């Protein structure tokens, strides 16, 4: 138990710190979503792990419930609360069920961060610039300044994200305001990770066949 007033760690570190595949995937997420470090990836992964753990417990209750396969009592209430929260934040669709929680990935959580939404709404040119605008107090939700890039944004609040009233960015002639939104940002079905992978594939130089032949032995 932590001391009163002392913040406890809100994430779990990887059990095996030197797994090459996991480390490469974390670096890819850090770059795609403009994260400060891997701790922000671990926070999202820990949140997802919590929801998936609750979903497994609920599905176990469904399996042990007999032929009806329906949750009753506080299990049904718990299921409704989890689903309604995930739907409210746009992490799952409105018609999703408990099974759909198990198919979620870390990027589904990262997509709902304020930093990601500022980029998708065309308020910043890059994901790094989106983070800068937020931390410098240029972004507001419902007119209130928001300075935490990692806060999760609900679907309702998403409609009210904009520049803060006294920010210089309120001027349409400001040089740092983006002119237009990229096409992949307007498509919410395409995650920033998928867009980054597609861009990397396009920029990768084609492999040349053959190569210079080695000369024969010494004369």
From Swiss-Prot:
Residues 193-219 are annotated as: Disordered. Residues 112-174 form the S4 RNA-binding domain. It holds the Pfam family S4. GO terms for cellular component: small ribosomal subunit. The keyword Ribosomal protein applies. It comes from Methanosarcina mazei (strain ATCC BAA-159 / DSM 3647 / Goe1 / Go1 / JCM 11833 / OCM 88). The gene is rps4. Keywords: Ribonucleoprotein, Ribosomal protein, RNA-binding, rRNA-binding. This is Small ribosomal subunit protein uS4. One of the primary rRNA binding proteins, it binds directly to 16S rRNA where it nucleates assembly of the body of the 30S subunit. With S5 and S12 plays an important role in translational accuracy. GO terms for molecular function: rRNA binding; structural constituent of ribosome. Belongs to the universal ribosomal protein uS4 family. Part of the 30S ribosomal subunit. Contacts protein S5. The interaction surface between S4 and S5 is involved in control of translational fidelity. Residues 199-210 have a biased composition (Basic and acidic residues). The keyword Ribonucleoprotein applies. SMART domains: Ribosomal_S4, S4.
């Amino acid at each position: 138990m932590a001391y009163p007033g002392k913040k406890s760690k809100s994430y779990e570190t990887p059990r095996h710190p030197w797994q090459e595949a996991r480390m490469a995937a974390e670096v890819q997420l850090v770059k795609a979503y403009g994260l400060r470090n891997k701790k922000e990836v671990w926070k999202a992964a820990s949140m997802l792990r919590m929801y998936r753990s609750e979903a497994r417990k609920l599905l176990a209750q469904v399996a042990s419930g007999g032929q009806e396969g329906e949750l009753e009592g506080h299990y049904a209430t718990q299921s409704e609360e989890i689903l309604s929260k995930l739907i409210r934040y746009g992490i799952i669709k409105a018609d999703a069920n408990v099974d759909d929680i198990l198919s979620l990935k870390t990027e589904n959580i990262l997509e709902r961060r304020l930093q990601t939404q500022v980029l998708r709404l065309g308020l910043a040119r890059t994901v790094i610039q989106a983070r800068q605008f937020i931390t410098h107090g240029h972004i507001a939700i419902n007119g209130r300044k928001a300075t935490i890039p990692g806060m999760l944004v609900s679907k309702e609040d998403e409609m009210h994200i904009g520049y803060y009233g006294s920010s210089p960015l309120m001027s349409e002639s400001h040089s740092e305001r983006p002119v237009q939104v990229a096409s992949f940002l307007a498509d919410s079905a395409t995650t920033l990770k998928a867009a980054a992978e597609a861009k990397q594939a396009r920029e990768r130089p084609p492999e040349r066949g053959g190569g210079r032949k080695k000369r024969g032995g010494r004369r």
